[in-house]
UniProtKB/Swiss-Prot annotation:
Database matches in Gene3D superfamilies: 2.40.50.100
InterPro entries: 2-oxoA_DH_lipoyl-BS, Biotin_lipoyl, GCV_H, GCV_H/Fam206, GCV_H_sub, Single_hybrid_motif
Domain (Lipoyl-binding) ranges: 24-106
Gene that produces this protein: gcvH
Superkingdom as given in the UniProt entry: Bacteria
Cofactor(s) required, per the database record: (R)-lipoate
GO biological process, one term: glycine decarboxylation via glycine cleavage system
Protein name: Glycine cleavage system H protein
Protein keywords: Lipoyl
Modified residues (N6-lipoyllysine): 65
Cofactor descriptive note: Binds 1 lipoyl cofactor covalently.
Oligomer status and interactors: The glycine cleavage system is composed of four proteins: P, T, L and H.
Length: 129
């Protein structure tokens, strides 16, 4: 069974968000998602300064099995991207909730957080797959 940290919020499309001290949110994909995809070989990230929209694709994770679109859980501006993934995409596999993060976004509407799932709700999504 996948690890689902209780302090994070989740999208049903398997992205997670973590609030940072500056009010921005770090985004990555869940341990469950990386297990389904398998070994990462390439990650395409948005650009710093890009505007992303909740529910729209903004990144791509390519594994030995498939390429998968990554959706932004929140609308806002990309403040940072995890440049370490360019040379080490396997960080998504080894540390999905830590060093394998994708990007940080400053949300334009924090009310969108209400559309995200808590750990229990996300577990229910996985169980229904």
């Amino acid at each position: 069974m996948s690890n689902i940290p209780a302090e994070l919020k989740y999208a049903s499309s398997h992205e997670w968000v973590r609030k940072e001290e500056d009010g921005s949110y770090t985004v990555g994909i869940s341990e469950h998602a990386q297990e389904l995809l398998g070994d990462m070989v390439f990650v395409e990230l948005p650009e710093v300064g890009d505007d992303v929209n909740a529910g729209e694709d903004c990144a791509v994770a390519e594994s030995v099995k498939a390429a998968s679109d990554i959706y932004s859980p929140l609308t806002g501006e990309v403040l940072a991207v995890n440049e370490a993934l360019e040379d080490s995409p396997e960080l998504v596999n080894s540390d999905a909730f830590g060093d394998g993060w994708f990007f940080r976004v400053m949300p334009s509407d924090t009310a969108e957080l209400e559309n995200l799932l808590d750990a229990e709700g996300y577990q229910a999504v996985i169980d229904d797959e």
